[in-house]
Every structure is written in C-alpha cells, then in structure tokens.
Swiss-Prot record:
Domain Cupin type-1: 42-271, 332-481
Organism in which the protein naturally occurs: Brassica napus (Rape)
Role, per record: This is a seed storage protein.
Complex and partners: Hexamer; each subunit is composed of an acidic and a basic chain derived from a single precursor and linked by a disulfide bond.
UniProt key word Cytoplasm: no
Pfam family of the protein (one): Cupin_1
Gene name in the database record: CRU1
UniProt protein name: Cruciferin CRU1
Length: 509
C-alpha cells in the first residue's frame, strides 16, 4: 500500500508538470515545440506566408519554426509599391528594420509627445495671421463685424484682448503632426513597442523592408505570438495560417456612437473610420499627391555629417535634445562605405550600429550589422557572445557553416538573396563567398552585441599561450606558432589560395 505522504508527493509532482505544460501553452508555445531550442539541425529559411494588399504585400517567416522560436523573434518582409502607403500600425514588441531597396518617408506616433511639424500656410479663404474658422464661423463673420462697429471703445478693447488670447491658443495651421523622416536604401529603423508608424513610397520602384520583432523582449507583456495592432486598414485574409478570420483596425470594435462622442464627430463619419467594408488591406494606394509636412531631403554626406559631428562630446552642435524620447533619432544609414567599421578594398566591409551610434537601440535592446563580402573572400570564424543573430541575405550568395555547442556541424549550405539564417548565441559560424559577392544584414538581440573570433589577430587562439595550444591539440611548438600568427587580419580574409598578407597591406578601420 502506498503511504499517504508518498501519494501526496506524487500528486504534487504531476500537478507541477501539468502546470508547466499549461504555462507553456499560455505563452503561445505549441505542444510540438516543447523543446524549442533543440537546434541540432539548422536550415536556411524562406517566407512561408504572404498577405496581399492593394498596393503591396507582407511576407512572413513561420514564427513557430524551432530556430525562430528559440531566438524569440518574428521576421517579415514588407514590399510597398510605388505610391503605396503602409497604414499606421504598432506592435507589442520592439521592432528593428532595414531598407533593402527604394526610398520613402515614414512617421511614428510617440504617445504624449507634441506635434512638432507644422504647416502654417493659411487655408483657402483665410487671411494671413487669422485663426481657422469653420463654416458656421465664416457665415457669421459679417454679422460680428457689424456688431463690432457699434461697440464702444471699451468693448473693442475687451474683444481685442479676447481675440489676442484666442490667437495665441489657436493659430492658423493647416496641419500639424509628429516627426516625419526620409528613409532610403541602407537605413536602419528602430521602433519602440506600442509606437504607431507609417511609411509611404516616394520612389519609382518598390520599397522593400526586412523587419524583425523581438517578441521575447521585456517590453512585450503578452505571449510569444507576433501581434499586429492597426490604427487604420485591415487584413481581409486573416492573421496567420491558423487564424483565418478577417482582422479589422482597433476602432472597429467600438460602438460608433461612443466613437462619435469621443472624437466629437457624427456617427456616419465614425462608421467610416471603422473600415467595415474596406478590403484594401494594410498597404493602400494613394490617389493624387501625398502632401505632409516634411523637411527637404538632405544630401547623403551632409546628413551623416550632421548626425555624427566631429569633436568632443560637449560639441556646440549638440543641442541636448537627442536624449528625450520625443526627439530621439530612429534612423541610421549603415550602407555608406565611409561609415564602415572594417574595410578592406579587395575583400569587403562590415558596419555595425548599436546603442552608441543610435541611442534608441539601448531602449529596445537590439542592434544590427551590415556586411558586403566580395568574391573569394571569407568572414573569419566567430561566435556571438551575448546575442542571437538573424542573418538575411540582401544580394548574392555565400556558403555558411554553423557549429553548435557539441562541436557538430548543424548547417552547411549556400545562402541566396531573400533567404534567412538563424545563428544562436554561442554557435560558431563562418561565411565564405566564391565567384559572386555576398551582401547581408544581421539583426542581433542585444543593444551592444559582442563577437569573439576563432582566427585572426584578435582571436581566442591568438590570446592563448603557446604551451596551452601545444598541449591542447598535441602539436609541436612551431605548428602552434603558425596557428597563432599566420592570420594577421581581424575580420575578413581571402577564402582560398594566396600567401598570408603582411600587416602593411591590411587596411582596417
């Protein structure tokens, strides 16, 4: 007979197991992904789902894939056609994006921040310097002027005082909104959780943007399913392969009368906001000119020089506003060769952006690396010390090998344009191009991601004493010297053939 204490212990253990399973399901982890980080076999990934709209489409990678699920991210590719507008949307997770192709303008809505972009040109039929008036105010304007002529001097002074106060409170703005910025090929765009953003394609080709949501980020207080919240637009095709019902914007769920009272509009207009019969999707085509208040487009060199002024931290060019969340920069172009962190004329270049170059990344805890590898070149073997890496090929092809913690090769494939590779934290990898160039963008789940190389001048092997190397690998002292000192580069090298370069031939920044 089983004793009562033993039975209680067994029952308690079963309850703990069931509670763990229910908790995992409540976090959005499907039962088949109970061991989501079993990464013994990685693969090159492509989009599995496409959501089409009137003026573009959004392609999604399966976020239930064990590799993507383990990294705690969700990846999508947004294609906006010429004249297309990606309607205001926000997410429960922070988002980092890279503009692969094209140009446009984008805006974000930061709650609590003022509208700092204003168009002060008067409306049609409005005199310069006078506040805007509605239709009723215009109809009664003549009567008010006649009444003013009959008033005494004291009444005129009192009315002028009231008009002056109203003029200070309400100026003749046609429109006023939060910050609008130009975006172009090579831009990194960072968006905080809960901040709505929109994008309009101003170019003559499709605007292509690769996006990453960090759904494991501390800012996401929901489950590990990517959730899209729309201020406008809809998704008539459903949210995913498992969720086929139509998704409406957030205003659709309110009673139209309540919405009309909140916005002080009529019920008919409130129903228009709910887009009940609109099937255009979340990317719509703009008919006619798209007129928003925006600054003129800078020259690329002038823009970078303004963002990164030379001189000490207390430079006179720094006005101190960049530390506020309302005016904090969200864009940084990392495709300019002059911005390269590592540059070798015959091999390629690597550029990183982190919280030091784009402070908002410290808040969302993400960073990015842009790389261009020429033919017959190699990125020396390395691993990420404190981040997962999601590598996306923007051009060309290359061979990528990944080794796990057991020393097993878990990936050895050719990666081509439009494909994705997840490289978990601590997994060593090497990138090798052949005849074709290889270009990529990597998103990393740390604001200041660090790497450690396994070969080269700053590698882990270079830092070890010769005696440690000889005893670890059972080799001679001369062989240990060759292992330590034959590769003089730090990041990029030749992929095949040739003799080791002299230090004088290395050009790295």
């Amino acid at each position: 007979m089983v004793k009562v204490p033993h039975l209680l212990v067994a029952t308690f253990g079963v309850l703990l197991v069931l509670n763990g399973c229910l908790a995992r399901q409540s976090l959005g982890v499907p039962p088949q992904l109970g061991n989501a980080c079993n990464l013994d076999n990685l693969d090159v990934l492509q989009p599995t789902e496409t959501i089409k709209s009137e003026a573009g489409r959004v392609e999604y990678w399966d976020h239930n894939n064990p590799q993507i699920r383990c990294a705690g991210v969700s990846v999508s590719r947004v294609i906006i056609e010429q004249g297309g507008l990606y309607l205001p949307t926000f997410f429960s997770s922070p988002k980092i994006s890279y503009v692969v192709q094209g140009m446009g303008i984008s805006g974000r809505v930061v709650p609590g921040c003022a509208e700092t972009f204003m168009d002060s040109q008067p409306m049609q039929g409005q005199q310069q310097g006078q506040p805007w008036q509605g239709q009723q105010g215009q109809q009664g304007q003549q009567g008010q002027q006649g009444q003013q002529g009959q008033q005494g001097q004291q009444g005129q002074q009192g009315q002028q005082g009231q008009q002056g106060q109203q003029g200070q409170q309400q100026q003749g703005f046609r429109d006023m909104h939060q910050k609008v910025e130009h975006v172009r090929h090579g831009d990194i765009i960072a968006i905080t959780a809960g901040s709505s953003h929109w994008i309009y394609n101003t170019g003559d080709q499709p605007l292509v943007i690769i996006c990453l949501l960090d759904i494991a980020n501390y800012q996401n207080q929901l489950d590990r399913n990517p959730r899209t919240f729309r201020l406008a637009g809809n998704n008539p095709q459903g949210g995913s392969q498992q969720q086929q019902q139509q998704q409406q914007n957030m205003l659709s769920g309110f009673d139209p009368q309540v919405l009309a009272q909140a916005l002080k509009i009529d019920v008919r207009l409130a129903q228009e906001l709910q887009n009940q019969q609109d099937s255009r999707g979340n990317i719509v085509r703009v008919k006619g000119p798209f007129q928003v208040v925006r600054p003129p487009l800078r020259q690329p060199y002038e823009s970078e020089q303004w963002r990164h002024p030379r001189g000490p931290p207390q430079s006179p060019q720094d006005n101190g506003l960049e530390e506020t969340i309302c005016s904090m920069r969200t864009h940084e172009n990392i495709d300019d060769p002059a911005r390269a962190d590592v540059y070798k004329p015959n091999l390629g270049r690597v550029t990183s952006v982190n919280s030091y170059t784009l402070p908002i990344l410290q808040y969302i805890r993400l960073s990015a690396t842009r790389g261009i590898l020429q033919g017959n070149a190699m990125v020396l073997p390395k691993y990420n010390m404190n981040a997962n890496e999601i590598l996306y090929c923007t051009q060309g092809q290359a061979r990528i090998q990944v080794v796990n913690d057991n020393g097993q090769n878990v990936l050895d494939q050719q990666v081509q344009k439009g494909q994705l590779v997840v490289i978990p934290q601590g997994f060593a990898y090497v990138v090798q191009s052949h005849q074709n160039n290889f270009e990529w963008i990597s998103f990393k789940t740390n604001a200041n991601a660090m790497v450690s190389t396994l070969a080269g001048r700053t590698s882990a092997l270079r830092a070890l004493p010769l005696e440690v190397i000889t005893n670890a690998f059972q080799i001679s002292l001369e062989e240990a010297r060759r292992i330590k000192f034959n590769t003089l580069e730090t990041t990029l090298t030749r992929a095949r053939g040739g003799q080791p370069q002299l230090i004088e031939e290395i050009v790295e920044a």
